[in-house]
A protein has these predicted regions:
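ABC-family nucleotide-binding domains
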Residues: 174
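Hydrophobic anchor residue at the start of the ABC signature
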Residues: 153
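Q-loop/switch helix immediately C-terminal to the Walker
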Residues: 89, 97-111
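Conserved ABC ATPase "signature" region
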Residues: 106, 117-135
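ABC ATPase NBD Q-loop/coupling interface
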Residues: 63-78
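Catalytic Walker B motif of ABC-type/P-loop ATPase nucleotide-binding domains
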Residues: 164-168
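Conserved ABC ATPase signature
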Residues: 139-143, 147
Length: 225
């Protein structure tokens, strides 16, 4: 599903050495990439989400593919049905044009021009997975940080992506909510044949739910297990 072979990325105007990645994973399930603040986790997450070159300018060399398509070949808007990225700041990922959580979750599927029956099925299933059913009629602006993170993850799940990137997407959740969501997401990925890639600073509890993991250090990836 994701392949990076001696893949080098040098951001525009960067004075640092280029990032150099070797990564290959094709099975459904959940894997993790760990790294300290400033290690380049978000940059790699955005590369894997297909943000280059639209929102991630710079130069790339060597081989990189996402779901079989070379990085940079498919416009970001065309990738939204198959690749989703959830980042650390949930408030920045709300559409800003809906008046309820239910409308927010429906926003993505509606933009795919899906049938109404399919949209309704998705806005039932995604909030159920993330424990957002009691929030369905709340205005997004009234949600707490943890509630907003669960809603944003539900929005991504409602798109039914083959590749879901979660960049510190659990930072505002309680430990209990984090464990619950990891367990459900792991099951969802295996059931649907999708791949979830977690980007986190700390290994606990995430490593317990992952089939494989890497450490991002010195602008490169090192296998952990």
């Amino acid at each position: 599903m994701v392949t990076l072979e001696q893949f080098r990325y040098c951001p525009t105007h960067s004075t640092h050495p280029p990032f150099c990645y070797d990564f290959h994973y094709v099975k459904p399930g959940m894997v993790a990439i760990f790294g300290d603040n400033g290690s380049g986790k978000s940059t790699l997450a955005q590369l894997m989400a297909g943000w280059y070159p639209d929102f991630l300018p710079g130069e790339i060399t060597c081989t990189g593919t996402l779901l079989g398509t070379p990085i940079g070949r498919l416009p970001l808007n065309e990738q939204s049905a198959t690749i989703q990225l959830v980042q650390q700041s949930p408030y920045l990922q709300l559409s800003g044009c809906t008046f309820s959580v239910e409308e927010e979750v429906a926003f993505g599927p509606e933009n795919l021009c899906l049938a109404e029956k399919e949209i309704m099925a998705r806005i039932d299933a995604a909030p159920a997975l993330t424990e957002c059913q009691p929030l369905r009629h709340r205005h997004p602006a009234t949600l707490s940080g943890g509630e907003t993170q669960r809603v944003v993850i539900a929005c991504a799940i409602a798109m039914q992506p083959k590749l879901l990137i979660l960049d510190e997407a659990f930072s505002r959740l309680t430990p209990q909510a984090c464990e619950m969501l990891l367990q459900r997401l792991q099951h969802w990925a295996l059931e649907r044949g999708s791949l979830i890639i977690l980007f986190e600073r700390h290994r606990t509890p995430f490593l317990n739910y992952c089939q494989q993991a890497w450490q991002l250090q010195n602008r490169a990836l090192k296998p952990l297990c």
